[in-house]
Amino acid sequence: MTKTVFVLITDWAYYNKAITTIRDLRTVGCWNGEIVLITIDFNLDENIKNDLKLTEMKFPSINKSNLLEKIGPNGFSNSDKREIHKLNQWEKLHVFDDYFLKWDRVAYLDAGLRVLDNVQYLLELDCQNKILAPNDASPNFRPDQIFKYQISYDNEEMVHLVKSDFGVDIFEKHHMLNCMWLYDTSILKICNKEQLIEAMNKYTLCKTNEMGIMNLLFHFKNNLWEEFPLKASNGKYLFEWCELNHSHHTTWRDYCFIKYPVTIRLEDRPLL
C-alpha cells in the first residue's frame, strides 16, 4: 500500500488559513491519513494538534543572507518585491527534506487553499518518478505566462548564467505553479532540499522566490514535472487559481481545489 502524507507550512500570520485547509482535508477531502504541519515562528497548540491529528514539524530556518545580499535592499526592478518582503516562501523548500523519505508520496497544499472534494481525485494520479503540479498558464495560456516573465533581468551576468546552465529555450516554456503539488519521494534521490537551497543562492533572479528555483531544478534541469490534468475523473476541474479564470460561469462546486475562490468564503465550510 502506498504511504502518503499531506504537508502544509505556515507562519503565525497564515495560521488560520492553514487550519481552514486542514479542516477541509479532514472533512470534505475525506483524508484520514497523516498530515504534517511545518510551523515557522510559533508552536502548535496541543489541542489543535490532537483534534486534527497533526504532526508538527520544525526545521532550521533557511539562511537567506547570501540571497538578499545578491538581490540588494531594493529588490528587483520588475517585481512585486516579494523577493525582499515574503521571505518565508523559501521555507516551502523544507517539503523536499529527506525527512519525507519515510513516505512514498507527498502532497503539498498552500495555507488557505481550499479542498472542495475528496482528495482521492488527486491521489489517483500517477506520480511515479515525477512531481505533479498545475501549469501556471492553464487554462487560458496567455503569451505572458511563460518562464521568461518569472525572472529579473537586472543582473545581466546572472541571466547569462541561467542561459548557460539551462539553455535559452527555457525562457519560452511553460512552468509549474507551486501552490500545490504531489510528488514521488524517489525524486529526492535526484533533487532534494540541499540542491534547491544551493540553487537558491546561485540563481538569485527569481521574482517568484522558491517557485522559480523549483522550476529550474525539477522542470528544466531534471525533467521531473508533469502538469495536472485539467479535469479530474469525477468531471470537475482538478485545480484552479480562481473561478474567474474561466470565461464561462463556474462556482466552487465545479472544482476539487481552488487557491483563491470567490464563490466561497474562507470561513465557509464546503457542503457537497
Q: How would you label these PLM feature ranges?
A:
Residues 34-41, 133-135:
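Short internal beta-strands
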Residues 46-100:
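Active-site-proximal specificity loops/subdomain of glycosyltransferases
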Residues 24-32:
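Short, acidic, metal-binding catalytic loop of nucleotide-sugar glycosyltransferases
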Residues 39-45, 115-119, 231-233:
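Short, polar loop motifs at secondary-structure junctions
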Residues 15-16, 41-48, 141-142:
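Short, charged/polar "capping" segments at the starts of alpha-helices
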Residues 1-4, 8, 14-20, 37, ...:
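A glycosyltransferase accessory/donor-loop signature
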Residues 88-146, 183:
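GT-A fold catalytic core of metal-dependent nucleotide-sugar glycosyltransferases
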Residues 62-84, 142-168:
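Charged, glycine/proline-rich intrinsically disordered loops and linkers
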